[in-house]
């Protein structure tokens, strides 16, 4: 597991990882100290989900541990902290002042299927899905909402102002990629990918092509 990162400025960050059992114990202790009945928080998670293997380890906090510019002025609290549901889903994000800045809601029946999220101080964005688990609507009460229509190798996105974009896809499963995008203004951008799904080239609406060479 990755527990430390160094950025280009020489700053060191410590990544705090927790297991499902640790989070369950923390939830029990918080309930006891608060004088409330502990909620159901299992000590383990299913080892495999529809998204792949799951060892139950989650990122819980990020600390700045070294700053070459300000070595004696390190923060006394994590830069960011993450809260998780009993099912291992991201529930909330807290900033360095311990203020909640993001929250997430999930489908009761389908683990990991996000049905809403909110930035603190903004309206809640909600999602609806079809029977195959694909997003069909993104609902924003204070801005643009979107509908998604799926066909073979084609996704049509329409906003609440009736503007439409079309995504053309190629590939299967995890290698499916958007190879052409028809924008609402009629312009088109195209992309090419290699055999493992990495972007090789992109052509913009003016016909200019940018090529990419992965450093592997």
Show where each model-derived region lies.
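Extended charged/polar low-complexity repeat regions
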Residues: 1-216
